[in-house]
Amino acid sequence: MSAAKLPKSFVWGYATAAYQIEGSPDKDGREPSIWDTFCKAPGKIADGSSGDVATDSYNRWREDVQLLKSYGVKAYRFSLSWSRIIPKGGRSDPVNGAGIKHYRTLIEELVKEGITPFVTLYHWDLPQALDDRYGGWLNKEEAIQDFTNYAKLCFESFGDLVQNWITFNEPWVISVMGYGNGIFAPGHVSNTEPWIVSHHIILAHAHAVKLYRDEFKEKQGGQIGITLDSHWLIPYDDTDASKEATLRAMEFKLGRFANPIYKGEYPPRIKKILGDRLPEFTPEEIELVKGSSDFFGLNTYTTHLVQDGGSDELAGFVKTGHTRADGTQLGTQSDMGWLQTYGPGFRWLLNYLWKAYDKPVYVTENGFPVKGENDLPVEQAVDDTDRQAYYRDYTEALLQAVTEDGADVRGYFGWSLLDNFEWAEGYKVRFGVTHVDYETQKRTPKKSAEFLSRWFKEHIEE
């Protein structure tokens, strides 16, 4: 192990999302989001479940805060349920005081315990009423105004205690999984809608950031940014075709959001392939969008090998996987087909982002679902050897990126604090460092939680 340490200011903790943990879908005035609706559609969720109960964190949040405290974290990243705060979502719709009070109390408790809140405004749960009213993210003018209004209410209600804001979590997933292949809510299948939705989300993000900077930043002193998801990508072999495919895949996954937000324009390969199906920014919009994130929020889990080909335009006509040309695997297989352990890729990705986009990086999600863990009794599930090995590799890569390569990485959040509702997989896949018995809601720390607590204690300057 390296003797080098992360700076004293480095923050670490765990991340969650409202729909994955809260439950209580209609308690205290909350109304449905598109995920409540989507879960009711037959065949959409692998085990036929929903987030109706999840980890019951709307009621058990104090227990969650105490768990965070016991793990010694410095920060906690969580998301707000828009339809808990403005049940019907719109700028003319009534505000739900009970929803604001709930989050205010949670934030106050975190601050009291010395845990810094990192608050995500949108983690995929659009109020259903807005989807019904005007098609949600497909409607540029309406969606931007309603999101900005919601953001403003959150800045007003919580901004005196919250210094770290994230507008959107993983717009790639929202647009591609929600509007491209239909695997996630609202379940649309289209080859044009994802580009429209992406475009509108980038603009909604930029409008919310401008509002924060104009009206709140000076008195509240916080920072605001966005979280993008990306794997590290490596050419499958040494051919020019694989190298070009890798660059193209990176633009289609990451560049489609990062380039406009940090550089002010869409990447060249996307423009070339999509032509006039790619919406254009006006000069005024470019000015608004460019530089609209104070940091780079990164969700990353794995590395993929890339080769040219395939019919998937949303991915950039590439094929990806974990099997090398010689038949060996990149790393340990997880419970999700797309995820294997590969620590070196994490180090390379951190270096790439820091250099390419010139902003401090916060790793806002990183984690591993152990293969078959859901089938194990709790006594075995907590002895999560593969997850511990994953975190050992990834924390070491983080340390090397910061202390050896000089990458400006300022925070790290493990996914997730708890086993929870894993979207289309339902409750079959477990990402938590804390085991949850869904029958009783009993929380039991896994060995990986112990490992991370110890590692960060040893590797952050006193």
UniProtKB/Swiss-Prot annotation:
Keywords noted in UniProt: Carbohydrate metabolism, Cellulose degradation, Glycosidase, Hydrolase, Polysaccharide degradation
Record-listed substrate binding positions: Q20, H123, N169, Y301, W415, E422, W423
Entry superkingdom: Eukaryota
Catalytic activity, reaction form: Hydrolysis of terminal, non-reducing beta-D-glucosyl residues with release of beta-D-glucose
Active site: E170 (proton donor), E365 (nucleophile)
Variation of activity with pH: Optimum pH is 6.0-6.5.
InterPro entries, alphabetized: Glyco_hydro_1, Glyco_hydro_1_beta-glucosidase, Glyco_hydro_1_N_CS, Glycoside_hydrolase_SF
Enzyme class name: hydrolase
Documented effect of changing V173C: 2-fold decrease in affinity for cellobiose
A GO biological-process term: cellulose catabolic process
Induction: Expressed constitutively in cellobiose and glucose cultures.
Disulfide partners: none
A single MF term (Gene Ontology): cellobiose glucosidase activity
Entry EC number(s): 3.2.1.21
Family in the record: Belongs to the glycosyl hydrolase 1 family.
Function: Plays an important role in cellulose degradation. Shows hydrolytic activity against several glycosidic compounds.
Protein name, entry field: Beta-glucosidase 1A
Taxonomic source organism: Phanerodontia chrysosporium (White-rot fungus)
Gene assigned in the entry: BGL1A
